[in-house]
From Swiss-Prot:
The chain crosses the membrane at residues 36-56, 264-284, 298-318. This is Transmembrane and ubiquitin-like domain-containing protein 2. Residues 173-246 form the Ubiquitin-like domain. GO terms for biological process: ERAD pathway. Keywords: Membrane, Transmembrane, Transmembrane helix. Disulfide bonds: none annotated. It comes from Mus musculus (Mouse). InterPro entries: TMUB1/2, Ubiquitin-like_dom, Ubiquitin-like_domsf. Pfam families: ubiquitin.
Amino acid sequence: MISRLLQNNLMSVDPVSSQAMELSDVTLIEGVGNEVMVVAGVVALTLALVLAWLSTYVADSGNNQLLGTIVSAGDTSVLHLGHVDQLVNQGTPEPTEHPHPSGGNDDKAEETSDSGGDATGEPGARGEMEPSLEHLLDIQGLPKRQAGLGSSRPEAPLGLDDGSCLSPSPSLINVRLKFLNDTEELAVARPEDTVGTLKSKYFPGQESQMKLIYQGRLLQDPARTLSSLNITNNCVIHCHRSPPGAAVSGPSASLTPTTEQSSLGVNVGSLMVPVFVVLLGVVWYFRINYRQFFTGPATISLVGVTVFFSILVFGMYGR
């Protein structure tokens, strides 16, 4: 009996213990233990703290970049820079050292002579240093000196920057031929050359296909000279190459496409109003004969559209 009771108790306890074991085996990431996750979290936190501390580190700026010194009483305060001090030191001769003779009296005499020499030499040295410092630190006079240097340089004559714009001789002019793809070609011609000569010289065999446009005018007359068209040196002439079968001479060729487009636009515009009138008439016919299919809002909308269209038509054709 006792053994059976123990077996029953063990069987009743086994599910609870199995659930506890399952809960203890649960991890945050499958295949990785909780201890590893804790260690990784501690390492990540440590790295974040180290990076935060490094981000607040500021390097000490050198004290040798800008030094300000105050001159003793009686002298003007001057801001000394490193390179200014070097220039001043180069300009002033270094004092030579004199050997000190032995003896107290000689030392006293030398001290008095040195003090007297320094007293007389300091004003001269300051007088030599102050003009050089004032010249170097004169910020307001810097633009004037630069302007003086710029004016002393000889100015290059106009037209020398670009060698292509210069004409080879006084009797020749440079003409820039610009195409639709923004490419340019430099043509050298004489003022008495004609448009036909320019075409045959630079577009041989394509004279009938090339169209030259200058200041919005189409150069159609091949017998006109460049001087008569006010084409001077470095002028720009726009060039257009038409397809071989589309070259039609005369002003009628240029007017035909525009007239066709305008007539097409007039026809479409004139047809819009009759078509809309017919549509409104059909809708009103169905409204009168089949009024059971039209609700109140639909009827009100139809009346509003009709009134708006009538006002628009009277406004267009009543002028």
